[in-house]
Swiss-Prot record:
Oligomeric form and interacting partners: Binds to the N-terminus of tropomyosin and to actin.
Record organism: Homo sapiens (Human)
Keywords (A to Z) from UniProt: Actin-binding, Cytoplasm, Cytoskeleton, Phosphoprotein
PANTHER family cross-referenced by the UniProt entry: TROPOMODULIN, TROPOMODULIN-2
Residue stretches spanning the membrane: none
GO molecular function: actin binding; tropomyosin binding
Record has Cytoplasm as a keyword: yes
Protein family according to the UniProt entry: Belongs to the tropomodulin family.
GO terms of biological process kind: actin filament organization; learning or memory; muscle contraction; myofibril assembly; nervous system development; neuron-neuron synaptic transmission; pointed-end actin filament capping; positive regulation of G protein-coupled receptor signaling pathway
Tissue-specific expression: Neuronal-tissue specific.
Protein's name in the database: Tropomodulin-2
InterPro entries, A to Z: LRR_dom_sf (IPR032675), TMOD (IPR004934)
């Protein structure tokens, strides 16, 4: 089922992009480059040969045709003759011929084991099934599948077939891939802007084709929304501008209690903006920022630890610290905040 915005994009399929770009001025082209940098900061959607920007503004000194150059190089390579060997190869072998040493054959000596008379009598009178069970308990699994042992047991039983005591393994349960996120981005954004009371949780996880401006609109809509309590945008290719937009939202929003921005492209700059915003927020109790594309660094982790020590409302903080100092401080701060909530709950129950 095609989404509404996908239907609108169909009318742009037959547009000549080269003609449109040729009509743009230099200033308009620079503005377009800035917009593309915001949409794709890592240039992951471009081929590897086009990710490097121009390093100079100088005009070309002569015409350059890449296809013509490749054809010329290929033609020159085919026309040039191979260089003849000055010293022909005669096949003469020099030096000693490597002969591997023969390893001595190891012979195993059987150790004689003497058992108690009671054990020998018990083993002599044991049935084949009991011997199989004993071999399984002792871990002698090669004995269970040994054909010689099967022949001996069959002969001892008067020509009957061997006893099979094979443990069958459990069937492997198939693991199916998770279905795509069914959240409709446009409808959710419209509901948030309209402050729909039925929308209390928004889940945009793993939707990788959401434009950066649309994610900013979500943050802008949360500034005035009074019903959404949980918002999650993990693995949506969000970057620092998105994190800064959500930081501005946290300074104003008084309803949101949980925010998840894990597995994105946010650097220390965006995380520091969120940390500063949490100092002015009184409602958020859970935030997850782990698994970003690059490590945040010691300075950012120390700022996070200081913020959590001063914030008594955050009960869950999703981040794996790389340094022992900030990790210990954050663990103590989170434990203290949860103890305060527990004490308030106990006092309320007593009343």
């Amino acid at each position: 089922m095609a989404l509404p915005f996908q239907k609108e994009l169909e009318k742009y399929k037959n547009i000549d992009e080269d003609e449109l770009l040729g009509k743009l001025s230099e200033e308009e082209l620079k503005q377009l480059e800035n917009v593309l940098d915001d949409l794709d900061p890592e240039s992951a959607m471009l081929p590897a040969g086009f990710r490097q920007k121009d390093q100079t503004q100088k005009a070309a000194t002569g015409p350059f045709d890449r296809e013509h150059l490749l054809m010329y190089l290929e033609k020159e390579a085919l026309e040039q003759k191979d260089r003849e060997d000055f010293v022909p190869f005669t096949g003469e072998k020099k030096g000693r011929v490597f002969i591997p040493k023969e390893k001595p054959i190891e012979t195993r000596k059987e150790e004689k084991v003497t058992l108690d008379p009671e054990l020998e009598e018990a083993l002599a009178s044991a049935s084949d099934t009991e011997l199989y069970d004993l071999a399984a308990v002792l871990g002698v699994h090669n004995l269970l599948n040994n054909p010689k042992f099967d022949e001996e047991t069959a002969n001892n039983k008067g020509g009957k077939g061997p006893v099979r005591n094979v443990v069958k393994g459990e069937k492997v349960k198939p693991v199916f891939e998770e279905p795509p996120n069914p959240t409709n981005v446009e409808i959710s954004l419209q509901q948030m802007k309209a402050n729909d009371p039925s929308l209390q949780e928004v889940n945009l996880n793993n939707i990788k084709n959401i434009p950066i401006p649309t994610l900013r609109e979500f943050a802008k809509a949360l500034e005035t929304n009074t019903h959404v309590k949980k918002f999650s945008l993990a693995a949506t290719r969000s970057n620092d501008p998105v994190a800064i937009a959500f930081a501005d939202m946290l300074k104003v929003n008084k309803t949101l209690t949980s925010l998840n921005i894990e597995s994105n492209f946010i650097t220390g700059t965006g995380i520091l903006a969120l940390v500063e915003a949490l100092k002015e927020n009184d409602t958020l109790t859970e935030i997850k920022i782990d698994n970003q594309r690059q490590q945040l660094g010691t300075a950012v982790e120390m700022e996070i630890a200081q913020m959590l020590e001063e914030n008594s409302r955050i009960l869950k903080f999703g981040y794996q610290f790389t340094k022992q100092g900030p990790r210990t401080r954050v663990a103590a701060a989170i434990t203290k905040n949860n103890d305060l909530v527990r004490k308030k709950r106990v006092e309320a129950d007593r009343r």
